Amino acid sequence: MVVRYARSLACVLVATAHLTAVPCLAQPDDAQTEPTVIYTVTASERANHKLQVEAEFPAGSFFGGERTLALPVWTPGSYKVRDYSKFVSGVQLLNGGGAARLEKSAKNRWTVVGDFPKDRPVRVAYTVYGHELTVRTNFFTPELSLLIGAATFLAPAPLSGDRLEETNFEVRLSGVTDPVSTGLEPVAGKSEPTFVAAGYDELVDSPILFGDISEHSFQAGNKPHILIQAGDRRYWSLASSLRDAAKVVETVQEFWGEVPYDTYRIMNLITDTRGGLEHLDSTVVMTSRFATEDRDKYVEWLALICHEFFHAWNVKRLRPVALGPFDYEREVTTPSLWVAEGVTSYYDDLLVRRAGLSTRTEYLKALSGQLNTLLNTPGRKSLPLTEASLDAWIRLYQPTDNSINDDISYYNKGAVVAWLLDTEIRQASKGSKTLDTVMRQAYRQFSAGGFKEDEFRALASKISENDLEGFFERALDTTEELPIDGALEYWGLEWQPDDAKVAAQAYLGLNTAGGDARLVESVVAGSPAALAGLAPGDELLAIDGTRVPPTGPGSIVKFLEVGGRYPVLVSRLGRLTECSVVFTTSPAPKRVLKAKTGKGAQPERIEAWLGPESKVPEKSKGVEAP
C-alpha cells in the first residue's frame, strides 16, 4: 500500500455543469516532500492524436548503476499484454552532452549508454500516440483526451509497484486550458494543471481526463463523489443518472459496511462504445449517448457503474495475492479471477435490484442471460474455471474463431458460480449466512496482504459451517455441469423456454459477423453446421435455394423442417461449396427465470435475496446543456 497525499475537503466541488481549468487545488502539506520524478506533458498536437512528454528522473530514482527506463506492457484490471511502447516514438536523452544517448534495450526499455555521470539526473523526451477509444488505452483529440498512465509514463526499471512506492511523481499539463479531472492530487500555486502521485502504482492507477467535460458532485456515506460527463451529452438525462448513481454508491457502501477512499470519481464517457475499468479511487466507463432513453440500456449502465464501483473493494483492496504489488513488465497470473470478476459480475445486477433501481423481473432477466450464455458455450465442457482465470492473458482477451468451443469466461461462469455459492451458503446455514457475509469477512481478513485461492474457499466453508470443498472442486476445478437444478428448486424458480415456438424451430449452430451477417464467425461444436462441415470464414450465400440476406440466415432457417436435410451454398476461399445440413432443434434454447406462484414458491427466500419489490424511479426530465 502506498501512502496517499492528504486531501483537502476544501477542494470538493458543488454540483455544477461547468468547470474552470483546474477545479480544485490541494493545499501543500508541510510534511509532504516534493515529487522526485517530473513529467511535463504538452498537448498542443492533440489534433494529430499526439502528446509530447519531457521527463526528469533524479539519479536516486534508479535501481543500481544502470540507467534504464521502461514502459508497462499492460494495465491493471485488463489482463492482456498490450505493448504500449508501440505507441511511443522519438525517445531521446536531452542531457547526454554528446557523450551519451538512449539505446533501445528491450521492446519496452531504453538504456543510457556512453559517458554519463551517475549523479546526474536523466532527462528524456518522447512522443505518445493515442487514438484508440477504450478504457485501457490513450485517446487524444481536441474535444476529449483520456490519458492512461500505463501507456504514457516511462519510469526507472524494473517496473514494480513495491520498488517504486517510495518515489514520488509529478505531472504537469503544459498548455492545457480545458477542464481536467483525475484522482491524482492537485498541487496549489501552479500556473498550469499539476498533480502528484505517491508511488508509481498510484500514478498508473489514476487516469487523467481533459477536454469538453463537466463535473457533478454528490455525497454518499459522508464522502464526496464526482460524476464526470464527457462526450455528447445532448440526449443524456443528467438528473436521472446523478440520482441513480448516488443510490448505487450508497447500496454498495452499505453492502461492505465501510468506505475506504476519500473521494471517488465516475468518469462517464458518452461515446457509443461500452466498457469499464476500475481504479483505486475512480473508474472509467463508456456508454451509449441514448442509454438514458432506453430502459434496458440504462439498467445495463447502472450495473456497469455498480460493477466498477464494487471493485473499489473487491480487486482494488480485497485481491488475490498475485494482483499487487504489480509487475508491469510481464503477465501476472492467478486462478482467482472468478472471485475478482465473477463475484463482482454476480453482484452488479443484484445490487442494482436491491437499490430499487430495477425490478425483480429485470433482475431475473439479467440472471437468465448469464445462464443462457453459459449453457450456449460448449467451452464450459472443455476448460475449468480456474484454468480460464490463469489463461486470461491468452484466451479471454485474445479470442479465436474456436473460443466458443474451447474457452469459458470467468466473468460469465464466475457469476453463475457465485450465485450457486450464495445458494449453497444460504442453504447450509438455513439463511443465516450468505455470500455477502463471506465477502465482508474476506475484506476484513485479506485486504492487507491478499488471499490465496484455498484461503478464500476455506473461509466460505467456515462461515457456512459446511464443507464446501466438493462444491468448489466441481464448480471451479472440473468441467462437470453445475448444480443449477438444485438452486432453482431452493429459490422456487421456473426455468422455461422464453418462446416455445422459437425453441421448436430448426437450429443451425453458428454465429455470424456483426456487420455482414452472412459471414460465419464461429461454428458450435457438434451442431448441424459443424457436422456438415461449415467453417469460420465461410460466406453464406443460399439455404435451400433461397439467397441469404445481409441480416443473416435466421429468417430462412426458422421455416425449415426439423430433421430435414437442406443444401447450404457458401463461398470459401473464393470458390463455391455446397454443404448438406440436417437441421435439429437447439440443445439450449433461450430460457427465462420466473418465480413460482404456487407449489414450490419461496417468497421469503426471494425477498431475503432480492429485497422487497419496489417501483423504480421515473426518468427525470431534462438533459445537460451542451
What are the functions of these language-model segments?
Residues 1-6:
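N-terminal secretory signal peptides that target proteins for export/translocation
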Residues 8-21:
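Bacterial N-terminal signal peptides
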Residues 27-74:
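Early extracytoplasmic/domain-onset interaction patches
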Residues 36-38, 50-54, 66-68, 121-123, ...:
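Intrinsic-disorder/low-complexity, polar/charged segments enriched in Ser/Thr/Lys/Arg/Asp/Glu/Gln
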Residues 44, 56, 76, 81-90, ...:
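Non-catalytic architectural context of zinc metalloproteases
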Residues 91, 252, 339-351:
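An active-site-proximal "capping" alpha-helix that borders the catalytic cofactor pocket
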Residues 214-337, 343:
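Juxtacatalytic substrate-recognition/specificity segment
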Residues 348, 358-626:
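C-terminal recognition in membrane/secretory proteostasis and scaffolding
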